[in-house]
Amino acid sequence: YIENDKISVCVDAVQVRDNLQLLGQNNVPEEWTDAVGTDGNLVNNTLSYIKSGNGIDSVDEIVKTESVKQKLVYATVTYTNKSDEEINHMLYIGTLLLMDHEDGSYQIYDPTEQSGDDYDRVIWDGVARTAEMTYNSISEDYGNGGNYISSLKPGESIQVNMAWIVNENDLNNMYLNLNGDGAAYEFSDSMLKTGLVDIYQ
């Protein structure tokens, strides 16, 4: 639950699914159309662990591959206008970020920048990604991206659905940022003030 002087935001539900049925037939983002297999479920994502070469004596090398399931994360969120004035063209944004938690401290990480003993980055062939939502249920032909609520009268609430496709092995470390700044790879002042939603609780 997040609020400021004008708007409050409440996460009503977060659902995790193997398919895109929650979106309906006509609302699937174009970049997700190839992510569904013949059985109707999301296809697996092939991760390739890369050892980078120096470009002179050695080239980039795939040291191992791994197949992981992709999952739909579907968040239902309610925005409420707490002010005395109508709010027009309200930008809304949800971002997922990944955090490690150890010894009381949290650190944001990018899964493509993970490294190990024999690799220094990870790439994959699926559509899985965190950061900004790929699907949103309410849009307005306004601004860049269309993720606007056209009007919210004083005291009025509106429910919005947002969705991402993610790698299943990242779910335990996934947090939802709804403060509107879109931060996903570093802590922002507004994020630290409003907090995050642990979606896997």
Predicted segments, located by residue:
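Conserved functional micro-motifs across diverse proteins
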Residues: 1-201
